[in-house]
Amino acid sequence: MLNKPEVLIEAITAREILDSRGRPTIEAEVLLETGAFGIAQVPSGASTGSFEAHELRDDDPARYAGKGVLTAVRNVKEKIAPQLLGTNAFDQASIDQKMIDRDGSSNKKELGANAILGVSLATAKAASAELDIPLYRYLGGPLANVLPVPMMNVLNGGSHADNNVDFQEFMIMPVGADSFTEGLRWGAEVFATLSKVLKERKLLSGVGDEGGYAPNLASNQEALDLLIEAIERSNYKPGEQIALAMDVASSEFYKDGQYVYDGSAHSPQEFIDYLAKLVSEYPIISIEDGLQEEDWDNWKLHTQSLGSRIQLVGDDLFVTNPTRLQRGIDLGVANSILIKLNQIGTLTETLETIALATRCQYTSVISHRSGETEDTTIADLAVATRAGQIKTGSLCRSERVAKYNRLLRIEEELGDRALYAPKVGLGPKF
């Protein structure tokens, strides 16, 4: 991050707002002595890993069915603010460490990761506002000029939809485009065509949490077939111009050592073989959470099976946690990590995790959550870190499109300096 002479934090506050699912979340605001300020809104997940930092809820059944966050809001005002007032806003690492120390727990359960993250991000935004530079430039410096390839979740299943599809996300990736702007257009065109395909088959339904269609389908393979048809009918070439990706979210259908999908239970080896078969039959270049989050031995077999052919992303497996990521690196498990700010709870720890992945030649995918807001921080983070990939849902629902629109503005702002990740060898290596 860029540095500047000391500018002190003058005020910190927070409030309870609503996310895209109508559930409460935190909005934090940090004001500097110069009048510059930053506001950040914290997302929330539906399919959550067991090892994520703790999201503090009120558990008061009389308000929002227990989902309120007034306790976390009070923690910002009464515990975090007194600790940070008068602190240099440009010392992000020190600010984040002070909050971690004040919390004192291993998973931020005392103050709440949602409370801590809101202040962490709002501080960075205030600092970038003080310098009058965009957040991606503040975090990434002069090398922050690579636009990510979007992983567009156009068909939803699992915990993200009320349907019978086991796998959670079926995504398209415009890897053959010349720019982010062009890639986004390709994705929007395929999404529109997919709507027509589903309507013709009398499968058109509402959308899931992340804006993708959520029809009832006969199998997970039918979802892939629908994507191929939509791509081809949009006059694009599957695999060459637009590739496929999946978030299997297998922890959600792992029961008693078996993987239960398409109506029956399967052994881990059968499931590994099934995923390999799908990769052989479809232009899939990325699979997320192919095995259950604690099934380390079979994750290793899964990596041996597909790790040299496609990107294998750990989400529930790694939960943006450097300790779990290091274990995966040591064991030879996966080759990519999903990055979700609220899984670890501070900006500094997020950046450290991305740096560890990069050093060890793991790719990073910057990601939203199923419960989102209009906050566009992850768009700036993707450019700042040159991650090369972003997951922020479908081409539907304004909390998803807000991130895409932010990336369009960044690409325009960068002008001739803007690079599209697949064109410079960043993002998936396959």
UniProtKB/Swiss-Prot annotation:
Gene Ontology MF annotations: magnesium ion binding; phosphopyruvate hydratase activity
Keywords per UniProt: Cytoplasm, Glycolysis, Lyase, Magnesium, Metal-binding, Secreted
Cofactor(s) needed by this chain: Mg(2+)
Keyword Lyase: yes
An example Gene Ontology CC term for this record: cell surface
UniProt keyword Magnesium present: yes
SMART domains registered for this protein in UniProt: Enolase_C, Enolase_N
Positions that bind (2R)-2-phosphoglycerate: 168, 340, 369-370, 391
Positions of Mg(2+) binding: 247, 288, 315
Pfam family, one: Enolase_C
Main location: cytoplasm
Top-level taxon of origin: Bacteria
Stored InterPro entries: Enolase (IPR000941), Enolase-like_C_sf (IPR036849), Enolase-like_N (IPR029017), Enolase_C (IPR020810), Enolase_CS (IPR020809), Enolase_N (IPR020811)
EC main group: lyase
Cofactor binding summary note: Binds a second Mg(2+) ion via substrate during catalysis.
Active-site annotation: 210, 340
GO biological process: glycolytic process
E.C. number(s) listed in UniProt: 4.2.1.11
Catalytic reaction annotation: (2R)-2-phosphoglycerate = phosphoenolpyruvate + H2O
Record's subcellular location: Cytoplasm; Secreted; Cell surface
Known pathway: Carbohydrate degradation; glycolysis; pyruvate from D-glyceraldehyde 3-phosphate: step 4/5
PANTHER family: ENOLASE (PTHR11902:SF1)
NCBIfam families membership: eno
Reported function: Catalyzes the reversible conversion of 2-phosphoglycerate (2-PG) into phosphoenolpyruvate (PEP). It is essential for the degradation of carbohydrates via glycolysis.
Family statement: Belongs to the enolase family.
The name this protein goes by in its record: Enolase
